Swiss-Prot record:
This is Chaperone protein HtpG. The keyword Cell membrane does not apply. Molecular chaperone. Has ATPase activity. Residues 1-342 are annotated as: A. It comes from Nitrosococcus oceani (strain ATCC 19707 / BCRC 17464 / JCM 30415 / NCIMB 11848 / C-107). It holds the Pfam family HATPase_c_3.
């Protein structure tokens, strides 16, 4: 079969067309990053070749000096980026360039807002890679051959970045990938050797293989002196292997942008070298913003694993727990075998030790930030707070340290901003208070306006206002903090302990006896809708509220589980009556059993709505309400 018969024209995946169009406009103000992305691809290809060559040295094809080379032609207006890494076969080209085989693609596209600055950050997080070439080029030609394939298995891919591309089989003598950009009008700056040198130095100086540029005619004398046609323009040293004192802040920031495909500087980082029984180096970064796919369960992790400076694998989930899945960086170990697999990683003492040490470093970094850079920590919490809350249940060994990092909204500020630490709460506890009080709800306004808070507000007792979906699991995993138990204000009988005097307790007992008959009448009318009816002193303004037993599932958690499609037992609530409320006083004197029944059901349904619950029969609720309104009007 001839080479020509292998040529075909294929259409881009719909998402690719959308991404190309959005990217060209959103990233144009930061267009030089295309070179960083294409160089990064070349570096990844070299890493993959090194790894595969560990078990098959023949893949080097007698050329183990890996590099990336830049060249340009001012007459043809082309810029070429070439590497001698692993290369690609025909099917790999189709899969890697014609489609986006990435979960969350649709969610990503939907999250784009039209705001160029915001969209640029999101596109960077998504990883534009090869597609960034179309920011400055109106035609891109890629020629590649996979290491180990014969010269006749070369592939040429070509596209103008519109709806389709052509792909054909070609002869290619050398392995690796060559990307040639036919630059758009007005992009002549990328045909300037000094401009290219500047971009490489700024974005890719840390890439640990040589990036070379073809000497210009003006450099002819230098070329004749040393006999070299190519000039290396980067340091080509793995940044994490250098002493911390030798690395500039700008170099750390540039390296972060490389590993995270981000446009912004990292929020913080920690660089550590461990020596002794176990030897490894870690360079870990906290991003400034949460990625769009933070809540995708199958999203990739952000840690690259190296063994003795040889890249082994991306997305090493064993190196960082899920609640720290936003961390980016590298880990380089001297104690793992070069041929380690993902299966071996799952039960490996070295990996377990590296993971434990890395987690300690990240938590320590965050603790230091919270203590000394409160504003920066608040920025971190706004982006990653909900994920950090998962750690309380996932990481029992570090639970206390994570608990110190938690931030909540509370009645102290009465704003939705989560700024209150548990230590802050303890420092403001009333004399005689022995519990940390909280309420969970499906929104901040619902938590803030809950009738369960009325007596706490009256007595000036602070209550944490929890409205994140993860909060129910958080409090279930955190029974106490520094000796003080956490207590839901919607569970069990209210016992304020030493915060109430004996006279108050005696008055409450007398009121309960006085309302015993009313309590029994309400229970008889409501039947199985409630587990119990009782008088309460937790209310000051509302007539009723619903609570559950101390160890029962809250109504909010029950709703969360059902929304997630999980089975949840129905918990019978307890209806509590406020004896000081005029409606309850009127109900006490109601002689008509029909009206009494309507009032009892209406109050129960009102309490259910107040805590975010749903009515089983909304039409019946409206009918009762209208009936009672008419009776009152008469």
């Amino acid at each position: 079969m001839t080479v020509a018969s292998h040529k075909e024209t294929l259409g881009f995946q719909t998402e690719v067309k959308q991404l190309l169009n959005l990217m060209i406009h959103a990233l144009y103000s930061n267009k030089e990053i295309f070179l960083r992305e294409l160089i990064s691809n070349g570096a990844d290809a070299a890493d993959k070749l090194r790894f595969e060559a560990l078990t098959d040295d023949a893949l080097y094809e007698d050329d183990s000096a890996l590099h990336i080379r830049l060249s340009y032609d001012k007459d043809k207006r082309t810029l070429t980026i070439a590497d001698n890494g692993i290369g690609m076969g025909r099917q790999e080209v189709v899969e890697n360039i014609g489609t986006i085989a990435k979960s969350g693609t649709r969610a990503f596209l939907e999250s784009l807002s039209g705001d160029q600055a915001k969209d640029a950050r999101l596109i960077g997080q998504f990883g534009v890679g090869f597609y960034s070439a179309f920011i400055v080029a109106d035609k891109v030609v890629l020629e590649t051959r996979r290491a180990g394939f014969g010269p006749e298995h070369g592939v040429r891919w070509e596209s103008g970045g519109a709806g389709d591309y052509t792909i054909e089989t070609i002869e290619k003598a050398t392995r690796g990938t060559v990307v040639t950009l036919h630059l758009r009008e007005g992009e002549d700056e990328f045909l300037d050797g000094w401009r290219l040198r500047h971009i490489v130095t700024r974005y890719s100086d840390h890439i640990d293989l040589p990036i070379e540029i073809k000497r210009e005619i003006g450099d002819e004398e230098k070329s004749e002196e040393n006999g070299e046609e190519w000039e290396q323009i980067n340091k080509a040293t793995a940044l994490w292997t250098l002493p911390k004192n030798d690395i500039k802040e700008e170099e750390y920031q540039a390296f972060y942008k490389h590993v995270a495909h981000d446009f912004e500087d990292p929020l913080a980082w920690t660089h550590n070298r461990v020596e002794g029984k176990l030897e490894y180096t870690s360079l870990l970064f906290i991003p400034p913003r949460a990625p769009f796919d933070l809540w995708e369960r199958d999203r990739t992790q952000g840690i690259k694993l190296y063994v003795q400076r040889v890249f082994i694998m991306d997305d090493t989930e064993q190196l960082m727990p899920r609640y720290l899945r936003f961390v980016r960086g590298v880990v380089d170990s001297n104690d793992l075998p070069l041929n380690i697999s993902r299966e071996i990683l799952q039960n490996n003492r070295v990996i377990d030790s590296i993971r434990a040490g890395s987690v300690k470093k990240i938590l320590g970094l965050l603790e230091d930030m919270a203590k000394h850079e409160a504003k920066k920590y608040q920025s971190f919490w706004k982006e990653f707070g909900q994920v950090m809350k998962e750690g309380v249940g996932e990481d029992s060994g570090n639970r206390e340290q994570i608990a110190r990092l938690l931030r909540f909204a509370s009645t102290h500020h009465d704003t939705a901003e989560q700024t209150v630490s548990l230590a802050d709460y303890l420092s403001r506890m009333k004399e005689g208070q022995d519990k940390i009080y909280y309420i969970t709800a499906d929104s901040f306004p619902a938590a803030k306006s809950s009738p369960h808070l009325e007596v706490f507000r009256k007595k000036g007792i602070e209550v944490l206002l929890l409205s994140d979906r993860v909060d129910e699991w958080l409090v279930a995993s955190l029974p106490e903090f520094e000796g003080k138990s956490l207590q839901s204000v919607t569970k069990g009988e209210l016992d304020l302990g030493h915060l109430e005097d004996e006279q108050e307790k005696q008055q409450q007992k007398e009121v309960e006896e006085d309302f015993q008959n009313l309590v029994e009448r309400v229970k008889n009318n409501l039947g199985d809708k409630v587990k119990e009816v009782r008088v309460t002193h937790r209310l000051t303004d509302s007539p009723v509220c619903l609570v559950v037993e101390q160890h029962d599932m809250s109504g909010y958690l029950e709703r969360l589980l059902k929304e997630a499609g999980q089975q949840a037992p129905h918990i019978q609530p307890i209806l509590e009556l406020n004896p000081a409320h005029p409606i309850i006083a009127r109900l006490k004197g109601e002689e008509s059993e029909e009206n009494f029944g309507d009032w009892a059901h209406l109050l129960f349904e009102q309490a259910l709505l107040a805590e975010g619950g749903r009515l089983e029969e909304p039409a019946l609720f409206v009918k009762r309400l209208n009936s009672l309104l008419l009776a009152m009007a008469d």
